[in-house]
């Protein structure tokens, strides 16, 4: 799928070349060349919010979980674990105040249907000013794209996490250490089980580097476990194509976006919304 006059996304050159003729059927010569689908990114940074942080990312957008390597040549020429249109992302971000490790797998067409599957597992540690936080858990989700409205989809998901709050800077704070049965506090290990559902309207020309269209999402989640509370997030983004070369390259894009979230009064501090930083 691409813009008029441009190669379809995922191909270096237009793959279809029809031969002229007067027959009711057109003979098509298919000559497709796949572009680069995998990325390896390595970086590091330092800032006043998170200290020194490294970043290593392996991202493959044409993954195949069933295509195991049969020889060293499959690994050397890049054919192992590729070819099914799945996405796999492995990220490691070690640091002095923040460290995060995640693995994500996405199947956009589960069993050749319009149902998509996404799974992820993560480990996270962050040293805040007033306490330290550690998380380990995973998520699984299903999505469905409507036939009558391809831009519209719905999703449902579940997340399970164990959140450990430790090393409080000040003792006796009720929100951290609690002050009775009605407020157990969040110090120690907390169980988080979230059940969510959402709706998405997406007209972007590309999910990775969009230049036109919009994305509007709304997700509601009910969390149970150590604390019980609802959460909701609305996000909207609009992309405007300002200028481009005659061949479609060198695009200048203006992007506008906003996020609105709400959460119940019993939400613990580790799941609150905060302005600025992370």
Briefly describe each language-model feature range.
Residues 1, 90-92, 123, 220-223:
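Conserved short loop/turn motifs at secondary-structure junctions
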Residues 1-47, 60, 68-107, 133-136, ...:
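Periplasmic polypeptide-binding modules associated with outer-membrane biogenesis and secretion
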Residues 19-27, 38-51, 57-59, 164, ...:
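C-terminal outer-membrane beta-barrel translocator/porin domains of Gram-negative envelope proteins
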Residues 36, 48-50, 64, 96-98, ...:
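Residues that cap or initiate secondary-structure elements
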Residues 63, 105, 122, 129-131, ...:
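Aromatic side chains
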Residues 64-85, 109-116, 147-153, 205-213, ...:
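Short loop/turn motifs that connect adjacent beta-strands in outer-membrane beta-barrel proteins
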Residues 94-191:
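Transmembrane beta-barrel wall of Gram-negative outer-membrane proteins
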